[in-house]
Regions:
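Anion-binding alpha/beta catalytic cores of soluble intermediary-metabolism enzymes, centered on
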Residues: 1-198, 204-252
């Protein structure tokens, strides 16, 4: 059986990425799970392996950001050419990446543009959690200031993200009828409009359209309960309206 080929970008050469990559690939279980290709500055992927370079935190941010972005570009090119089957990205310094000429808020936006894919969803998946069950979270909006979220969040966006999520759950997890939860924007799903109208104005129309399209979606469900309900098996994935509400639950 041909092993899965994985490109690993080393991230910011001044940071923890190369060191973490070296430690991970030294683990026999990880190293035996796939065929890994390190992608980064030549000094870091030379004959002595990851960590052989002499980059330090004192090195300039533009230079470090430039090579970190170039590693992602190279990995995407390899994936599109069929040379690798997947990409793993080590941490980057977003400010350095910007200083290096890569004008993206983060990895998801960069990967989407380099791959030429207009419709994408950022899906975080953990097959085991502290509560036992799996948790899959999609961020409807990603790297935005919180004050910009209400303007960016639309019914069209929620329909797109939930539909992409359902398609992915069928294709990658073989779940025939995925159950999607739409997380509320406001505390207690706004308690009938007492504080905020996003649930009635944005989430409710999205739910109607999803039902018409055959997507099994429920909501709006308050953030303080929806993730626990998902881990306990009630939902296969949660659509979070903004970055931190989804990532805080996922990383906990």
């Amino acid at each position: 059986m041909t092993p899965v080929r994985v490109a690993v970008t080393l991230g910011d050469p001044r940071g923890i990425g190369p060191e973490v990559t070296e430690a991970a690939l030294a683990d026999r279980e990880i190293a035996g799970a796939a065929s890994f290709v390190r992608v980064g500055p030549d000094a870091l992927v030379g004959p002595d392996g990851v960590g052989a370079g002499r980059w330090t935190p004192a090195d300039g941010a533009p230079a470090a950001g430039r090579v970190a972005g170039e590693a992602v570009r190279r990995a995407v090119a390899m994936a599109l050419a069929g040379e690798v089957d997947a990409i793993v990205t080590a941490p980057i310094d977003k400010a350095a990446v910007h200083a290096g000429g890569w004008n993206y808020p983060g990895h998801p936006e960069m990967l989407a543009e380099l791959a030429g894919v207009p419709r994408v969803a950022m899906l975080m998946a953990a097959e085991r959690t502290a509560l036992g069950g799996p948790l899959r979270v999609v961020l409807a909006t990603t790297h935005l200031a919180l004050r910009d979220v209400p303007a960016a969040l639309t019914a069209d966006l929620l329909v797109e993200q939930a539909t992409l999520t359902a398609d992915s759950l069928r294709a990658l997890w073989a779940i025939p009828r995925p159950r999607i939860a739409l997380c509320a924007v406001n505390p207690h799903a706004s308690d009938g409009g007492l504080f905020g109208d996003e649930e009635a104005r944005i989430v409710a129309p999205a739910l109607r359209r999803l039902a018409e399209g055959g997507v099994d979606a429920a909501g709006p469900i308050p953030a303080d309960t929806v993730f626990t309900r998902a881990v306990r098996g009630e939902f296969d994935a949660v659509i979070a309206p903004y970055h931190d509400v989804g990532m805080a639950a996922f990383k906990t």
